[in-house]
Design a protein with these regions (language model features):
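Short secondary-structure boundary micro-motifs
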Residues: 37-38, 55, 114-115, 167-169, ...
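A carboxyl-terminal module marker
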Residues: 3-5, 12, 42, 49, ...
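Extended, well-folded interaction surfaces typified by the phenylalanyl-tRNA synthetase beta subunit core
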Residues: 1-97, 304-314, 318-340
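Acidic-residue sensor for enzyme active/binding pockets
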Residues: 39, 101, 215
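Flexible beta->alpha loop and helix N-cap segments adjacent to enzyme active/binding sites
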Residues: 47-153
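Short, charged low-complexity intrinsically disordered segments located at boundaries
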Residues: 20-28, 59-61, 109-120, 183-190, ...
Length: 340
């Protein structure tokens, strides 16, 4: 043994430089933690009924030799693990729970070949998911408390994806409330979902309050546009306020998309912000609405439009055609009209 030569192991060292348009996983962890969530680390093995109930996965990947009977499937969603963490905390009287996990899920995909980091037939994307339950704020100066709701967690998703600007569209998910859930899109591509737990699963898990959850593809969360320098505007912006009467079913997203599409060719619109919604009071029996008043089933949406040019100060003659184009498009696509 003493005659064996001392030879240091040799291995190539290759620097892995992350692209500037991508942030690391630890940066994502810090960002979610800064929103008030605590990280959890869970098994990738889950119960069989989680896959059916929460992920809608009719063909999950089954383990040949599970370590326990209740851990017989490879997860295709992180939600079941977070719900189990919530249940554990509530059984120990936790008053407020906000947790997240960053981990892999496992999906069948025949196009995946075997490599150093993949297994044939199994797609293993990374995802980040979060769950919030209890009061929206840990403590308030006035002593009042408000329960966490869909919009609180939706704001967390927007903050996590910033500076990218996601859009949200109503969608159904096996784990989520059909009327309080949405698909998350970035540049028109679906990257995840956010919503309140389905009442059926809330009752099954015996939660006094429905938690709000989100799950996003990690690639979408780590993507970052490279900053581009631009000059400070030299000319003052011009603002116009319009109040548009539309049907109750018209959404904020549909309104904003129509406004931006109407002025895309001109390139003068810098911002559009909804600042007020008015709905008429229900009429009493036998009462008649005043002439020109909003009908039942209608609402008024007030929007502040901001126009600006990089080369000159805008005049009324330049702004008014853009406003007219917006009003015409709102009438043609959404059936809207200016409020009298």
């Amino acid at each position: 043994f003493n005659n064996l030569p001392t030879t240091a192991p040799l291995a190539p060292i290759t620097a892995r430089v992350r692209p500037e348009a991508q942030r690391g996983r630890f940066a994502v962890r810090r960002a979610v933690a800064a929103l008030g969530y605590q990280e959890t680390i869970n098994f990738s093995f889950v119960e069989a009924h989680w896959e059916q109930d929460l992920a809608g996965n009719a063909n999950p990947i089954k383990l040949l030799n599970p370590i326990a009977s209740q851990m017989s499937m490879m997860r295709s969603s992180l939600l079941g693990s977070l719900l189990q963490v919530l249940k554990f905390n509530l059984d120990r009287k936790a008053p407020r729970v906000r947790v997240f996990e960053l981990g892999r899920v496992y999906l069948r995909d025949d196009s995946v070949a075997t490599t150093d980091s993949t297994v044939r037939g199994v797609h293993q994307p990374m995802r980040v998911a979060g769950l919030a339950w209890g009061d929206a704020d840990e403590s308030r100066w006035d002593g009042k408390s408000e329960r966490i709701d869909f919009y609180d967690v939706k704001g967390d998703v927007e903050a996590l994806l910033a500076p990218l600007v996601p859009s949200f569209e109503a969608a159904e998910h096996p784990a989520l409330h059909p009327g309080r859930s949405a698909r998350v899109l970035v540049d028109g591509k679906a990257v995840g979902f956010v919503g309140e737990l389905h009442p059926r699963w809330r009752q099954k898990w015996d939660f006094a309050q429905a938690p709000v959850l989100f799950e996003l593809d990690l690639d979408a969360v780590t993507a970052r546009p490279v900053p581009v320098a631009q000059s400070v505007p030299k000319h003052q912006a011009v603002e116009r306020d319009i109040a548009v009467v539309v049907a109750e079913a018209v959404t904020h997203d549909a309104l904003m998309q129509t406004i931006r599409a109407a002025t895309a060719a001109q390139g003068l619109l810098r911002d559009a912000m909804l600042f007020d919604i008015y709905r008429p009071q229900p009429l009493r029996d036998g009462a008649v609405a005043a002439p020109g008043a909003l009908a039942q089933g209608e609402k008024s949406m007030a929007v502040r439009l901001s126009f600006q040019s990089d080369s000159t100060t805008l005049t009324d003659e330049q702004v008014e055609p853009a406003v007219r184009a917006i009003v015409e498009q709102l009438g043609a696509k959404l059936g809207g009209r200016l409020r009298g």
